[in-house]
Every structure is written in structure tokens, then in C-alpha cells.
Amino acid sequence: MSFLELKSVEVYYDDVPAIRGVSLKIEKGELVSIIGANGAGKTTTLNTISGLLQPRPGEIWFEDKRIDTLPAHRVADRGIVQIPEGRRLFPLMTVLENLKIGAYSPCAKGDYRRTLQDVFNLLPLLKERRNQIAHTLSGGEQQMLAIGRGLMGKPRLLMLDEPSLGLAPILVRAVFETVKKIKSQGTTVLLVEQNVRHSLELAHRGYVMENGRITLEGTGLEVLNNSHVKSAYLGI
């Protein structure tokens, strides 16, 4: 079985279907990208993996164990970390305090100092700004803090939801360079992103989601070069 596997997952808001029959796989060490328009079901998929939503029907397996019946905090304890869209920082806390909150799971608490140093090595700006209040950071700096906070949880699977949203092009490049470094360290990554070209160029494999369904899958370059993807998402 794959590192993470979704089997025919369906999620409803009341009686309205949000995702329908979603099946996808991620192997250990892969970076997998899900692309799609607003409302396609991408964030719902991440929230369901995280245990914030319950599939009905469908199954989610992580490291050969079924997790779709677990509450969200138990899913997080297994090493699944989600960095939400919009960063969701604690704005009146310092950078360091936000990072500490990321290390709440038992395994992360036990290795806090080493993990903090690893995060500072990856994102040296956070070390420089560690005593600065989070809401005074720029948008790009706040996104780096959100990524750093996620890494403090020592993720076995790191899920990023629209990390480049609302950022200037130069900051978008910086965010994707950071994701590339995380990938190179062997962390398994599930990336939801509307910046189609950047995300698929970086991905081992990609999925296209439309109207709550997976409509296309392949290697990152296969999906990027697909004629429908070029027309619908790249304007080519």
C-alpha cells in the first residue's frame, strides 16, 4: 500500500457533495500537486485527510493504517501536518511563539530544540525576526513563518494549501524555492496550488481536480503538457 492512499472518498456539506469518488496515492518522499479552480474540492480534500471532515463513504490510509475515523488531533499525532490557506498565524504572538505552537505533538515536543534549529537553518529570516510580532511581518515573511510552524510539527506528510496566494511574483519564487528545499530533504509533500506551472514543474506527480472529482493524473510534466491543462489553466 502507498504511504498515503485515498479510496473513493466522498465528502458532503449537509447534502451538497464537495468531493466525489476521489482516489489518489502518494509514495514516501514524493511531492504531489493537486491543481484546480476555486471550489474544485482541493481544500476539502486536505481537510478530510487532516481529520477535520469525515468521508462518507470512502477510506483514507496512512502508513498502512486507516485514519479516516480518527479525530484531527490523532491524525496530527501520526505526523500529518497541514499548513492552511491564508497562513492562520497567531498575529499578536512573536515569531518564536508561533513556532513553539507548531511543536505541540508529543514527538515534536521531545525534539523541540533540534527541530527549531533545523527550521532556522532552512529559514534564517525567522531566526532574525524571532522576537518580532507576527502581524508586523510582510505577507511573504508570514508565509515563511506558516511553513516554519508546520515544520516544527516534524511532519511525515506536509500538506500546503495555496502557499503562494496573494504574494508578489518575487515572493512566489521564494516560497517555491523553500518548498523545493523541503522536497530535497526527503519530506513527503502534498501541495495544493493555483500556480499551475510552478507546482507541476516541482511535482513528481500531479492531479487535476474539477467539480469535486479527479479528472487527470500523471507525472508533473505529463499533466503540465496536457492540452486541456494548457488551455484551461495556462491560457495556451
Model region roles, listed by residue range:
Residues 154:
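Conserved catalytic motifs of ABC-family nucleotide-binding domains
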Residues 14, 32, 70, 95-114, ...:
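ABC-type ATPase nucleotide-binding domains, specifically the catalytic core motifs of the NBD
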Residues 150-151:
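ABC ATPase C-loop
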Residues 58-66, 78, 112-116, 218:
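Conserved ABC transporter NBD signature motif
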Residues 50:
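Helix-to-loop junction immediately C-terminal to a conserved catalytic motif
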